[in-house]
From Swiss-Prot:
Keyword Acetylation carried by entry: no
Family that this chain belongs to: Belongs to the bacterial ribosomal protein bS6 family.
Pfam families associated with the record: Ribosomal_S6 (PF01250)
Functional note: Binds together with bS18 to 16S ribosomal RNA.
SUPFAM superfamilies documented for this protein: Ribosomal protein S6
Biological process according to GO: translation
Species in which this protein is naturally found: Nitrosospira multiformis (strain ATCC 25196 / NCIMB 11849 / C 71)
Any one Gene Ontology cellular component term annotated for this protein: cytosolic small ribosomal subunit
Biological classification of the source: Bacteria, Pseudomonadati, Pseudomonadota, Betaproteobacteria, Nitrosomonadales
Name of the molecule in the record: Small ribosomal subunit protein bS6
Positions with biased composition (Basic and acidic residues): 116-125
GO molecular function, one term: small ribosomal subunit rRNA binding
Keywords: Ribonucleoprotein, Ribosomal protein, RNA-binding, rRNA-binding
Annotated stretches, region: Disordered: 96-125
Length: 125
C-alpha cells in the first residue's frame, strides 16, 4: 500500500457537514484495510483567489495509507460531491504523523511557550 497526503476544500455553506464528510472518507479508507495516519481540520480560511464566487472555504488535511482502488474511490467521491470546491492528492514516500506547519502555528499562537514564561518571570525579579 502507498502513502498519500490529501487536502480538500469545502464550500463555506457546508462547514457544518465537514465532520460527516471526514467520517465518510475515513470509513472508505478503513473499510478497505487502509489507515489514516493524520487528520487535521484547519477550519475556515481565506482563499488566495475566488473559487465559484467564494472568498473563504473550509480546509481538511488527511494523510492515509491505501491501495489504488481505495484512492480511486476517494477521488471519485470528491469529484461528485458538490460541496468540495477543490482537492489535491500527493503521493508520499512514508507515513506522515507529525502535525503540519499550519497546526504548529495555531498551537504556538494559542498557548505561550513555558520557556518564554520562565524568562519573563526571571526578568521581572
Amino acid at each position: 500500500m502507498r502513502h498519500y497526503e490529501i487536502v480538500f476544500i469545502v464550500h463555506p455553506d457546508q462547514s457544518e457537514q465537514v465532520s460527516a464528510m471526514i467520517e465518510r472518507y475515513r470509513n472508505i479508507v478503513t473499510a478497505r484495510n487502509g489507515q489514516v495516519h493524520r487528520l487535521e481540520d484547519w477550519g475556515r480560511r481565506q482563499l488566495a483567489y475566488l473559487i465559484q464566487k467564494v472568498h473563504k472555504a473550509h480546509y481538511v488535511l488527511m494523510n492515509i495509507e491505501c491501495d489504488q482502488e481505495t484512492l480511486d474511490e476517494l477521488e471519485h467521491a470528491f469529484k461528485f460531491n458538490d460541496a468540495i470546491l477543490r482537492h489535491l492528492t500527493l503521493k508520499m514516500d512514508e507515513p506522515v504523523t507529525a502535525p503540519s506547519p499550519m497546526m504548529r502555528e495555531e498551537k504556538a499562537k494559542s498557548a505561550p511557550q513555558p520557556a518564554e514564561e520562565a524568562k519573563e518571570t526571571t526578568l521581572a525579579t
